[in-house]
């Protein structure tokens, strides 16, 4: 049986993922930093290079590869698009809000404070 605590965690995760997913569906990739991550992941996918980050067909050790790996997995599963470029970050945002609720609930033992903390983080993302 799922308790109310787990239902609230799931609801906060789902609220975050759906709202950010809906918002991200209409935004093109325009930020220069975001486009570097996307281009690097596409280049790495093209070369099947899961170890060395690449951009413009050159090795590029500017950032750790975890973000590139998440993007590459998203592209492998759903294809390359602006929307799928934002799936990993949307899932991380949902997990962050759910984790905020869970941790504050464990520390303060107050549902009200935990929900307010999670919603405050949600509004800042």
Where are these regions (language model features)?
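Membrane-integral, polyisoprenol-dependent glycosyltransferases
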Residues: 1-125
């Amino acid at each position: 049986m799922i308790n109310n605590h787990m239902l609230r965690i799931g609801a906060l995760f789902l609220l975050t993922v759906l709202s950010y997913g809906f918002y991200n569906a209409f935004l093109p990739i325009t930020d220069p930093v975001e486009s570097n991550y996307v281009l690097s992941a596409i280049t790495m996918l093209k070369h099947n290079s899961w170890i060395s980050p690449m951009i413009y067909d050159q090795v590029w050790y500017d950032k750790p590869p975890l973000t590139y790996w998440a993007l590459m997995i998203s592209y492998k599963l759903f294809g390359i698009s602006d929307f799928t470029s934002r799936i990993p970050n949307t899932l991380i945002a949902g997990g962050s809000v759910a984790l905020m609720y869970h941790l504050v609930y464990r520390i303060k033992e107050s549902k009200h404070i935990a929900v307010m903390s999670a919603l405050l983080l949600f509004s800042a993302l």
